[in-house]
């Protein structure tokens, strides 16, 4: 067999490539949004873990009223023996801080694994998008060259 026989050529229309690029762009946008949400969740868990550490070391705790810190409460007289930890969905459990730390660390580990997978998928999708964009750019350059020769 000659080298030419080993190479397979695939013919794809420009319309199909454009449709693929559009679908891939939407998928990339979805992955980027998911990535940002996962990072935000991990940062929230880190904040909760830090709050649990502070709880054990202080008489007074500052509690942020919202994500942006528009209002902060000074809280005293907290029962340091029990905290409520989110288990998932709408379920919370009253547990000791050490168990809450374990739950949060497990959650963080799971989210970090998902984040890693999303990051890999995002990299593959961006590479595929770049390849399609390169093909489309080459096709556009060839078309312009043909128009310049003819016109």
Curated annotation (Swiss-Prot):
Keyword vocabulary terms for this entry: Chaperone, Cytoplasm
Protein's UniProt keywords contain Cytoplasm: yes
Principal cellular location given in the protein's record: cytoplasm
Gene Ontology cellular-component annotations: cytoplasm; prefoldin complex
Subcellular location: Cytoplasm
InterPro entries noted in UniProt: PFD_alpha_archaea (IPR011599), Prefoldin (IPR009053), Prefoldin_subunit_alpha (IPR004127)
Lineage top rank: taxon: Archaea
GO MF annotation, one: unfolded protein binding
Ranges that cross the membrane: none
GO biological process, one term: protein folding
Signal peptide (UniProt feature, chain positions): none
CDD domains: Prefoldin_alpha
Similarity-based family: Belongs to the prefoldin subunit alpha family.
Function of the molecule: Molecular chaperone capable of stabilizing a range of proteins. Seems to fulfill an ATP-independent, HSP70-like function in archaeal de novo protein folding.
Quaternary structure (record): Heterohexamer of two alpha and four beta subunits.
Protein name (database record): Prefoldin subunit alpha
Native source organism of the sequence: Sulfurisphaera tokodaii (strain DSM 16993 / JCM 10545 / NBRC 100140 / 7)
The encoding gene: pfdA
């Amino acid at each position: 067999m000659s080298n030419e026989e080993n190479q397979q050529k695939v013919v794809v229309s420009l319309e199909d490539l454009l449709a693929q690029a559009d679908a891939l762009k939407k998928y990339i946008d979805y992955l980027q949004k998911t990535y940002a949400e996962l990072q935000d969740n991990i940062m929230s868990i880190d904040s909760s873990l830090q709050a649990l550490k502070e709880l054990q070391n202080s008489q007074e705790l500052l509690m942020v009223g919202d994500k942006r810190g528009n209002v902060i409460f000074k809280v005293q007289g907290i029962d340091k023996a029990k905290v409520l930890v989110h288990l998932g969905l709408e379920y919370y459990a009253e547990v000791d801080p050490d168990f809450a730390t374990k739950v949060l660390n497990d959650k963080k580990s799971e989210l970090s694994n998902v984040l890693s997978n999303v990051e890999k998928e995002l990299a593959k999708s961006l590479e595929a998008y770049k390849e399609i964009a390169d093909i489309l750019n080459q096709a556009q350059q060839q078309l312009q060259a043909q128009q310049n020769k003819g016109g």
